[in-house]
């Protein structure tokens, strides 16, 4: 199906998305970013929550991580938010759950400030590091306001190892990517994206920002090289 969507007649934006999406699928399938470990951690968290629970997925992409982790659980509703419309189309096509699912084409930062609803689970994976530092802090405050009293934030993201700068962290990540089973062209695409768009913070920064939002955290996942983390955060 995808080869038809990425046909040369497709609009450039659509074709570019599916080129990147296929690269992402290769990264996931080869576990380059430890998606299996992250998926296992997410599943444990979701299984521990009393049913039924509502989920808001900020920066959901194609929702594949959430859909898999929520499979078979008693979910009351799922809302995915992303700025990339083709990703949402893929999410809708791949969803076969029995619970109510809605996808919103919106900026994840703006959405959380305008939605008039609280959620039992708000999750975000590999999205926050694209934001400037001050926006990260304000975003976490807004997220905390939209949790039910018993709700939790599930945060998966890249981070800077202790005493490493953003540039040193990006370079360390790229050194690992050099061994990924993807083409040289794809590695170049990833590198350009990371240098221009990735702004990971230290764990200390993230911890302080969560505390300022009134949230405490428990670690559910940590990357073998300290470049990624997973938290469950509650009031």
Outline where the language-model segments fall.
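Core SAM-dependent methyltransferase catalytic element
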Residues: 216-235
């Amino acid at each position: 199906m995808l080869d038809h969507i990425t046909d040369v007649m497709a609009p450039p934006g659509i074709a570019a998305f599916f080129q990147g999406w296929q690269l992402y699928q290769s990264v996931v399938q080869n576990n380059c970013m430890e998606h299996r470990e992250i998926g296992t951690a997410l599943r444990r968290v979701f299984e521990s929550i009393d049913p039924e629970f509502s989920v808001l997925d900020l920066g959901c992409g194609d929702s594949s991580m959430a859909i898999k982790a929520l499979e078979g659980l008693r979910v009351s509703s799922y809302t995915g938010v992303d700025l990339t419309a083709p990703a949402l189309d893929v999410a809708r096509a791949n969803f076969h759950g029995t619970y109510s699912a809605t996808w919103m084409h919106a900026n994840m930062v703006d959405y959380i400030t305008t939605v008039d609803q609280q959620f039992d689970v708000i999750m975000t994976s590999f999205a926050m590091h694209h934001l400037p530092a001050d926006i990260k802090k304000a975003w976490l405050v807004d997220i905390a306001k939209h949790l039910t009293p018993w709700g939790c934030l599930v945060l998966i993201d890249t981070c800077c190892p202790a005493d490493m700068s953003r540039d040193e962290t990006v370079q360390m990540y790229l050194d690992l990517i050099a061994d990924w089973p993807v083409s040289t062209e794809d590695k170049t695409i990833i590198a350009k994206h990371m240098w221009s768009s990735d702004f990971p913070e230290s764990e200390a920064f993230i911890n302080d920002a969560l505390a300022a939002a009134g949230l405490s955290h428990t670690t559910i996942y940590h990357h073998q090289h300290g470049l990624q983390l997973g938290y469950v955060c509650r009031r």
